Amino acid sequence: MEIRKNTRSFSFVAFITAGILLSGCSISTATDYEKELLTFKKNRVTSLKSRSGYLNLVGLHWIAEGKSQFGSDPGNEFVFPKEFPANFGSVTKKGDRFIFNFRETVLLDSAEKISNFTFSTEALDHTFSWHSYQWFVIKRGENYAIRLKDFENPDMDPKFAIPYYPIDVSWKIKGSFEAYPPGKNRTISNIFGHPIEQPAIGIVSFLVGGKSFSLEAHMEGPKRTIIFMDGTTGNETYSGGRELYFDAPDGDGNVIVDFNKAFNFPCAFNLFTTCPVPPPINRLKINITAGEKVFK
């Protein structure tokens, strides 16, 4: 009888110990996830405030065929910030060429002093610099624009922070991925109404509250990306929608869609941006209460 009693006591202790260990694992996992999201949030701010980020943008000027003058004078086609001379220069578009002329010397590619420069629409990797400013030509669809940056932009507040929903692990959802045939593209528009083409890669499907939802994914450079709107769009979250990245599917076609990492388009932070508009297929009739909230 004594042996049986001790056995029961041992079993009870083992059960409690296992429970504590499992509980400890659960807490550890939650803490690891919180650390992961904290790193994600810090990296977001670092990226936005970097030289290649969007907080330093101070101008966006769409280039038409022919000659356009720029400078601080309001009479110019492109009005630059007040620190620039009244008539600073011009850009002339002739077919597939851009001809820049300046009344003061500027730095080409942060290295060579120039007062004029010509390049083709296939060579958009050149930059021009003057004091704290830098500008270059970007292409969106079939349209071209001068994008102007100020690396001393006062909008780059050291206290800059992005508001988020509280972390909710239930919004880290296991879904399935159905790939499109290779080479499939889709055409959507940006906020200016310009058509833009994106490589569409497939459909991500998942369940929320027992209901099935799906979103079309595309490639953004090397990243698998989803852009979407939902019931919070325009209220608690940015009016233009949000996006998120996801990893490659496993061997069974499973993916993880983590809405806690849903982030705002650059347009939520700066007016001089050219964000895409999520296609109708990616407008969810559900409130995604996770990830970044509207920036004010």
Predicted segments, located by residue:
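Bacterial N-terminal signal peptides that target proteins for export
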Residues: 2-14
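Flexible, glycine-rich surface segments
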Residues: 174-232, 238
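N-terminal cleavable signal peptides for secretion/export
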Residues: 27-78
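C-terminal motif of bacterial Sec signal peptides marking the signal peptidase cleavage site
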Residues: 23-24
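Surface-exposed beta-loop interaction hotspot
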Residues: 131-196
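Extended, aromatic/histidine-rich regions of cofactor-dependent oxidoreductases associated
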Residues: 160-162, 233, 254-256, 260-296
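A short, structured loop/turn motif at beta-sheet edges
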Residues: 248-254
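Forkhead-associated
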Residues: 57, 62-124
